[in-house]
Amino acid sequence: FKYRLSLRDKNNKAKYIDIGKFNDRYFVYTASAGIFTKASYSAPQNIKNLLGHFAYVLEGVKDLTQVKRMKLKIENEDEVIEGEYIFVAICNATSIGGVMTIDEGKVDFADGLFELLLIKYPKDLIELGIIINELTNQIYDKHIRLLKVSKLKISDSSDIDWSLDGEKEDGRKNMKFRVIHNAVKLVY
């Protein structure tokens, strides 16, 4: 935790961090939907205790057989984005579930912005290979988008379930997100 917040070499200082508000619920780390997100709240606690991170990997493998497309309309301050996606995350973190990483230089825990990560639904195996390469190499291009946002409106053609910091949030067709800037004071 200390490492993730860049607190490793300091003592007795205070640092403020942003949190997110997703509809009526607050979260610190990530709100996500799509492939692999169900693993964060469906892996049994005793298995998580026994296997740690590997429990999430095992649970996530089940998702590979049921990849669903999400038809999303996302409105932020600068643009309207519409498309079919297999994954969406609104996060203030450099790692999402230990599976995906975002370059440390792109994330600031107290800038009033969260990162919006979108992964397009692949049309075929070739496009899937491109997406895997982009994920592995942290390339944000036409298949994977990374944007900084302070508020969003998200509309979905169906009610998709979300994971908020690993807890299930039942799906809705219309969702709102906003950053609460410098909401939490950490003393270290």
Annotate each predicted stretch with a short phrase:
Residues N76-E77, E82, D108-D111, L118-Y188:
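ATP/nucleoside-binding phosphotransfer catalytic cores, i.e., glycine-rich phosphate-binding loops
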Residues T37-A39, E82-E84, S95-V99, D124-E127:
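Short acidic/glycine-rich loop or secondary-structure boundary segments that cap or lie
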Residues I47-A55, I96, G105-D124:
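Gly/Ser/Thr-rich active-site loops/lids in small-molecule metabolic enzymes
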Residues N23-D24, A31-T37, C91-T94, K120-P122, ...:
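Glycine-rich beta-alpha junction loops
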Residues K73, E84, A89-C91, E115-I119:
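Short, conserved beta-strand edge motifs with alternating hydrophobic and charged residues
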Residues S32, F36, A89-G105, K168:
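Glycine-rich phosphate/pyrophosphate-binding beta-alpha loops
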Residues G20, A39, V88, L116, ...:
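A residue-level signal for conserved active-site and pocket-lining positions in enzyme catalytic cores
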Residues F1-I86:
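Catalytic core of DAGKc-family lipid kinases
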